[in-house]
Structures are given as structure tokens and as C-alpha cells.
């Protein structure tokens, strides 16, 4: 079936979120609601993908274009309602020529809407021959949702909104998901006859189904997975849906051979990749394009963002962002790896160590209480506790090079740019301002002064 157009409705404010930003720009498992829905719809390859905006229109439009710069942005005018949003979209789509074929319409506040469900909906619509099809689901508590009212033959009569329903209508548990498929000709007739005769004084898209029924049959397809069409109206619903989704994600990873000790406290975003026999301890957040290899151990209480963890590495109580941790390397506890680090095989970044754009050679160790930024270390080098690479001169970031088989004493300060050759040993408390040749000893003579019988001024 050719999908002529897909219309994503993203014009609403989402007042129940109590937020300064539009509801569709809130995030779910690492992506905005809007981009997640556009992912699902875009995979259907519609001839035109349109996004309707109104509240903070420019901000929402920019987010939509960040997904696909070819997206058609439709700005809804001051007339409220989802029906009016579709009218605006159809007017703009019509400027490209007469519409034929099939039009998909979806809300943008269903972060788990998936391409598979949409394909099944389109197939059902094609096979049924109906002029319009609504995607539905059955809820234990349908409060707040539009109810699907059917006739004796099971055909859809209408959709009744919560504020407009009587007691028998509100007792219905089958609800509208705000996803529809129309034949283009049926949709054009239906939206041309909408009115605002309802409690909200808005143009409801749901009324288009009542109008459509006058010229064609209206069918309904029940989503096989209710979670995939669950909408988010407030932060309570957001947290509930996020937890349910995350537990599913954790369960699937466990079935795939990953050990997750406590799924209740482990959060894994959708684009994370892991190999079997990886171990995730409690309290971990795995985000972005993070990859974790077999036999690596992550946690407890660790955050990985776009990080790569190679086999048999161990990352404990640390935060790692845009960095690669080599095979059998040890990170933590309480290590902060900012973007751009490469930690070599069997290397270590220990307690209270911060690194940024550091390349640590195989077998090298930065055990504790150090800052290593804009620096590279060779192999089998040991950095004493309390060492700092002073990389910033107030204007530029400068580089420090420390070679292989180097032994740096405690409390060293490297004033970049500076190069230290292979096999160097430095004394404790040294300030290294100039290059040091290989196989040398370097130390700073800081004279120690002792004042006998000293008393502070207030005791004299």
C-alpha cells in the first residue's frame, strides 16, 4: 500500500506536564516523544511526512527538522483542535497537487508507538476496504480517553470524548489511540464538515469518523500491544510508562544472555548494545550509543553515556561519557571520564580521578586523586596520587605527553605543553615546566623551612 502522507500532530501544549517546553519535546529513553513517533512513522516511507505545530511552533519545528530536514512543517492557525490541525495539514498537502491513496494521522505523545503496529494497521485498512480505520486499545481504566462506540455489527459509530460522554458511553473500555488511517478522498470530505459543537469548543478529529461513516465504512484495529499506544499526559504517566518499558528492555537483555542483577534499578536506553555474559550490577544508567562487551562488569552505581566497554573491563561507581575503556581495564570507584578518553588494555583510572581527552597506554595506571586532561601516557606508566596536568593557559588547551615505563611521584604538576620521555622517574611534589629526556630523574627543589616555637598571631 502506498502511503501518500503521514501527518504527525504536534501542536499541543500539554498543560498537564506543567512544563515550560512543549510536551512532545520531553524525553523518553533518550529521545523526545516527537522524534520517537517520527522514527516509527518515517520507517513506513511516506511520500510526505508532515508535522503540525502551534505551541512554541519554531522550537517544535526545529526538533522535527533535526530528524528529517525534508519534513513538511504545517503551522496550525488560532482555531483550536485536532480536527483543525488536520485541516491545515490537508490544505498544505493539497498545494502539492490532488491527494489520492492513503493518509496516516497520529498524535505525537505515544513514545512507544512502533512501526510494526502501524504496518499492521495499514494492512488491516487495505484488506478491510474501509474508508477510515482507527487504531484502538482496551484499558482497565479508560478515564480521559475517547471511547469507541460501535453498532450491533461491530462497526465504529463514533468516538465520544470524556467530557461529552454519557454514563453508558463512558463505561466502554475500548478507547481511541489517536492514530487513524483514511483514504485521502474520504478524509477530505470528512474534515470539510467538522464543527465545534462540543464541550471544549474545538474541532475534534474524532468527529471526522462520524462524518466519514456517511460516505464509507469505518473500521477499527486493536493494537496487539497496549503499551505501544499508551499516551503520556503528565509526569506520573511518563514515569509509569518509562518503568514498564525499561523492565521490558531489561528482560529482553537477560533473555539474550546479559546478567542484570537488579532490573528495578538498572536503566537501559534503546540504542545501547551489549554482548552475552556482560554483567550489569545495581544502580546503573546505560545511555546513548553505549556498547558493552562480553565478560565486562559495569557497576554498581555507574552511568555510561555513548561509552565503549571492552571485554573483561570493570567500571565501578563512575561516570563515563564518549570514552573507550579497553580490555581488562579497571575504572573507579568514583572516576569521572569526560569525553574523548582512550583507556588501554589492562590500564586503570582509580578513585577520584578525572580525565578528559586522555589516551592511556596499555598497562598504565592513574590510581587516585588526579586530573589528566589533554594528555597521552605510554605503556606501563604509573602516575602518583594527586597529580595534575595543567592544560589551560587561559586561552588555549595545551598537551602533555608522558612516555612509557615512567614513574611519576605523588603530587606532581605538569605545566603544559610539556613532553616527558620514556623511562623517566619524577620526585614527589615536582612541578614539571620543561621537557624531560628519556631515562632521566626529574625533581623540583622546594626548600623546606622550619620556624621553631611558632605561635599564630592571635596567641602572641
Curated annotation (Swiss-Prot):
Residues 1-235 are annotated as: Pyrophosphorylase. Residues 257-460 are annotated as: N-acetyltransferase. Residues 236-256 are annotated as: Linker. It comes from the Bacteria. It is found in: Cytoplasm. Its cofactor is Mg(2+). In the N-terminal section; belongs to the N-acetylglucosamine-1-phosphate uridyltransferase family. NCBIfam families: glmU, PRK14352.1. This is Bifunctional protein GlmU. The lineage of its organism: Bacteria, Bacillati, Actinomycetota, Actinomycetes, Bifidobacteriales.
Amino acid at each position: 500500500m502506498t502511503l501518500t502522507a503521514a501527518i504527525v500532530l504536534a501542536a499541543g501544549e500539554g498543560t498537564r506536564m506543567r512544563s515550560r517546553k512543549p510536551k512532545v519535546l520531553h524525553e523518553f529513553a533518550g529521545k523526545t516523544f516527537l522524534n520517537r513517533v517520527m522514527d516509527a512513522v518515517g520507517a513506513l516511507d511516506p511520500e510526505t511526512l508532515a508535522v503540525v505545530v502551534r505551541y512554541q511552533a519554531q522550537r517544535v519545528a526545529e526538533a522535527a527538522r533535526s530528524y528529517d530536514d525534508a519534513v513538511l512543517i504545517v503551522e496550525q492557525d488560532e482555531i483550536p483542535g485536532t480536527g483543525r490541525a488536520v485541516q491545515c495539514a490537508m490544505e498544505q498537502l493539497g498545494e502539492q497537487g490532488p491527494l489520492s491513496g492513503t493518509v496516516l494521522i497520529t498524535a505525537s505523545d505515544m513514545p512507544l508507538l512502533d512501526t510494526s503496529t502501524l504496518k499492521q494497521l495499514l494492512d488491516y485498512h487495505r484488506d478491510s476496504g474501509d474508508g477510515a480505520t482507527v487504531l484502538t486499545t482496551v484499558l482497565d481504566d479508560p478515564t480521559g480517553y475517547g471511547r469507541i462506540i460501535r453498532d450491533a455489527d461491530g462497526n465504529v459509530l463514533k468516538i465520544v470524548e470524556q467530557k461529552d460522554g454519557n454514563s453508558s458511553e463512558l463505561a466502554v473500555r475500548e478507547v481511541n489511540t489517536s492514530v487513524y488511517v483514511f483514504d485521502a478522498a474520504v478524509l477530505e470530505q470528512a474534515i470539510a464538515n467538522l464543527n465545534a459543537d462540543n464541550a471544549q469548543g474545538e474541532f475534534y478529529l474524532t468527529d471526522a469518523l462520524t462524518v466519514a461513516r456517511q460516505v464509507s465504512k469505518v473500521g477499527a484495529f486493536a493494537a496487539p500491544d497496549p503499551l505501544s499506544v499508551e499516551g503520556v499526559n503528565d509526569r506520573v504517566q511518563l514515569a509509569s510508562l518509562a518503568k514498564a518499558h525499561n523492565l521490558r528492555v531489561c528482560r529482553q537483555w537477560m533473555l539474550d544472555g546479559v546478567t542484570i542483577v537488579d532490573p528495578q534499578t538498572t536503566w537501559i536506553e534503546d540504542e545501547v548494545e551489549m554482548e552475552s555474559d556482560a554483567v550489569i550490577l545495581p544502580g546503573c544508567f546505560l545511555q546513548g550509543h553505549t556498547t558493552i562487551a562480553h565478560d565486562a562488569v559495569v557497576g554498581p552505581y555507574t552511568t555510561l553515556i555513548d561509552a565503549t566497554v571492552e571485554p573483561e573491563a570493570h567500571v565501578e561507581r563512575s561516570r563515563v561519557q564518549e570514552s573507550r575503556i579497553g580490555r581488562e581495564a579497571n575504572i573507579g570507584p568514583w572516576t569521572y571520564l569526560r569525553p574523548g578518553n582512550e583507556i588501554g588494555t589492562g590500564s586503570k583510572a582509580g578513585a577520584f580521578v578525572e580525565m578528559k581527552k586522555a589516551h592511556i597506554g596499555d598497562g598504565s595506571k592513574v590510581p587516585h586523586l588526579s586530573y589528566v586532561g589533554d594528555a597521552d601516557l605510554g605503556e606501563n606508566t604509573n602516575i602518583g596520587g594527586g597529580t595534575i596536568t595543567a592544560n589551560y593557559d587561559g586561552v588555549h588547551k595545551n598537551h602533555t605527553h608522558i612516555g612509557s615505563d615512567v614513574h611519576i611521584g605523588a603530587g606532581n604538576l605538569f605545566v603544559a605543553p610539556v613532553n616527558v620521555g620514556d623511562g623517566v622517574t619524577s620526585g614527589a611534589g615536582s612541578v614539571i615546566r620543561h621537557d624531560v629526556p628519556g631515562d632521566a630523574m626529574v625533581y623540583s627543589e622546594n626548600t623546606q623551612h622550619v620556624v621553631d616555637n611558632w605561635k599564630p598571631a592571635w596567641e602572641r
